[in-house]
Every structure is written in structure tokens, then in C-alpha cells.
A protein has these predicted regions:
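A surface-exposed partner-binding patch
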Residues: 1-70, 135-198
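An amphipathic alpha-helical core segment
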Residues: 95-169
Length: 198
């Protein structure tokens, strides 16, 4: 792990912010979820990915292996871009940026362009460490019709994220163009993977 992550863990520990909207997590506890979501995607060739943070609605964040990725388990997407190999300074800036966005709007989940976290807490109570808010029936089964406050439930986060992956063939890749990114940085997936090999 990069030294900046160790420093963040040393100062903050594994913790939550804003009443459970955002968490700094132990990567080991979420590795099976990350591995399942990465399987058979273009990112798999880049090496191992780790969960460094998550939000209350099943998004997992990883900024560390030459890419910046977000796995959105509810909307069944993986978004990000290939940067190539990070220098140590670039890695520190990227990871610092991830944790700096804790108070930003983009860790929220919205319905009709309105954030719902406060409503979720009011309806279902605060989250435990291993819980998340989800929709039942799942978006993967019925699409946009799932995304209502009436369908919002509190669930075991890891179990639910694994279940959501089982409901789909492949995650959708958003805001990501592999060929253009690779051409821009003048490399290939194999070269990037080799640089990240332990």
C-alpha cells in the first residue's frame, strides 16, 4: 500500500463520515466484492484492485493502480479512466483527492436530481458498519422503477453487493474509453499490468 494510505489509516483509522454517508474501509474485508466486480472486465488485466472507501449506497472507490475507478453496485456500473503508471507524487495527489471529496455531493445517491441520504436515515435509521441502503426490487431487475424511496431498504452491504453482481452478465463501463486512453498515454494494457506486477 502507498505510504499515504498507511498515514490516513494511522490518523483516521477505518471510519465513517457524515453519519455513514462515506467510509474509509479495510481493503481485506471488501476484496471478494472488488474481485467479483472486476472479473471479465477490461480492468482485470491491470492487476489487483482494492477498496479504499465506500459510500452508503454501494459505491466502492479505488484510485491507486494507474486508474481511478468507482464501482457502483446499485446502478451496475464501473466508471473511471486509465491514467497509466502513477509516480509516487501523482498517486499521493490522487488518493488525497479521493479522501478530500468526502464532503462533496458526488458521494450521495440522487433520485430525480435530489440527494436522498438524509431521507434514508430518517426512514430506516443510521447504518451499521457493514450496512448500506439499497433498493428492492433491485435496479438490475426492473430498471428505473426500482429507484423510489418506497423501495429503499437497509441491507448487509457485502452480501448485497455480491448478490447484485450475480444478477447481471457484466457491469456497464461508463466515462471510460480504453482505446482512447491507451492511445493518449502511449501504452497497452499489458505494459500497464507489467508495471503494477508485485
Amino acid at each position: 500500500m502507498p505510504s499515504i494510505i498507511i498515514d490516513i489509516w494511522r490518523h483516521e483509522g477505518f471510519c465513517q463520515f457524515q453519519n455513514g454517508l462515506y467510509y474509509i474501509v479495510n481493503p481485506d474485508e471488501w476484496q471478494d466484492v472488488v474481485d467479483v466486480w472486476m472479473e471479465n472486465t477490461p480492468f482485470e488485466q491491470l492487476g489487483k484492485f482494492y477498496a479504499l472507501a465506500r459510500n452508503a449506497f454501494g459505491c466502492i472507490y479505488n484510485p491507486d493502480t494507474g486508474t481511478k475507478l468507482t464501482i457502483d453496485t446499485i446502478l451496475r456500473t464501473i466508471s473511471g479512466s486509465i491514467k497509466g503508471y502513477f509516480t509516487e507524487k501523482e498517486r499521493e495527489i490522487t488518493i488525497s483527492g479521493l479522501f478530500a471529496m468526502i464532503s462533496k455531493k458526488r458521494v450521495e445517491f440522487e433520485i430525480d436530481d435530489k440527494p436522498i441520504f438524509k431521507k434514508a436515515v430518517k426512514k430506516l435509521g443510521p447504518l451499521g458498519w457493514y450496512e448500506m441502503y439499497a433498493f428492492e426490487p433491485a435496479f438490475a431487475l426492473i430498471g428505473d422503477a426500482a429507484l423510489t424511496m418506497d423501495n429503499l431498504v437497509k441491507v448487509d452491504a457485502r452480501v448485497h453487493m455480491l448478490l447484485l453482481r450475480d444478477l447481471i452478465d457484466q457491469p456497464k463501463i461508463w466515462s471510460f474509453n480504453i482505446e482512447e486512453d491507451l492511445k493518449r498515454i502511449g501504452t497497452s494494457l499489458a505494459e500497464i499490468a507489467e508495471k503494477h506486477r508485485p
